[in-house]
Amino acid sequence: MSQNKLVSITIVTYNSGRFIKRCLESVLAQRYPSREIIVIDNNSQDGTVDILEQFEDRCTVVYNDENIGFAAAQNQAIGLSSGDWVLTLNPDVLLLPNFIQALVDAGQIHPKIGTVCGKLLAMTATFDIPARPLVDSTGIYFNPMLRHLDRGSQEIDNGHYLNFEYVFGATAAAALYRRQMIEDIAIVNEFFDPDFFVYREDADVAWRAQLMGWRCIYTPHARGYHVRNVLPGNRRALPPEINMHSVKNRFLMRIKNMTPDLYRRNWFSITVRDVVVLGACLLHEHSSLRAFVYLAKNWKRVIAKRREIMRRRRAKDDYIASWFSYRPVSRPAPKPTARTLAKARAARG
């Protein structure tokens, strides 16, 4: 339906040898013809490089000498890209053939749609699809404790989430971002915040985008599968480094994006969660105490980013506060039609 605007698919690999071949094959099988693929490898040591070399004639592949983190590597890929849209993709994602087309169609509905997400279903680490499909994500939402969660996560997929909806944000495992939004909300020319390194960087982008007046739409027509490694219930099984970044990024996200009004409305819930997090670090997860050392050392830079975000903020307090709920919040969105897509094409000349 949509005129074929160039879509840049950006993938970051780090010891992703189990997944990357099938991920790239699913991207190359997309029916959407106007695309470029950029892969940044963060110094993988597991054979990922050997696999990527097989795709160098169909992708741009950059091999970093060190692991600079997901956020910085995605920024690196975005800097090399030239598409009107950027699809960030995890290597453990498998896309159905119309995924990109459906995302682009949904993005044409309104010029202030800066992010588009589809319906991701859960998949095993061997890329097996369960007999009873489970939802992985249909967008992300925040609760009053400032926890960000995937909408529908681990629910049995019985045919729900069938409507186009505005949601708070998208998981960067498979999120389509409008170039105009990327440039508009970037801080110090960085879309993802490299201070995050890994984890929660997509929630930070979602919050910043909402503050700056952009919207995220969910389309049920874009379907894919994702191997989910980080879930609320499996924290103890994760590497200490990931858990440390999780703690650090919870506070980074808040320092940068939380308005005084939002804190006033939710201070009790936020404090309860902070006590739980700090108590867990002191009693059980000592390695995560490094998160607070990082915040102290980099305080001036983080505060400078906050000042810039608040200076450029466009959204009103009531609107932002309306998204923070213990139940996922969504709002009805129109479907893409031939007429809306034709208008979008005409506007582009």
What do the PLM-derived regions correspond to, one by one?
Residues 1-29:
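N-proximal low-complexity "stem/linker" segments adjacent to membrane-targeting elements
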Residues 24-66:
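Acidic donor-binding segment of Leloir-type glycosyltransferases
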Residues 64-81, 91, 102:
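Glycine-rich, basic loop-to-helix element that forms the pyrophosphate-binding segment
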Residues 86:
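Short aromatic/hydrophobic "clamp" motif used to bind/position activated sugar donors
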Residues 94-136, 140-147:
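Conserved donor NDP-sugar-binding/catalytic core segment of glycosyltransferases
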Residues 140, 144-149, 155-179, 198, ...:
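A recurrent flexible, glycine/aromatic-enriched loop bordering the glycosyltransferase active site
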Residues 168-186, 190-223:
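A short, conserved alpha-helix in the catalytic core of glycosyltransferases
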Residues 215-307, 312, 317-322, 326:
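Active-site-adjacent helix/loop segment of glycosyltransferases
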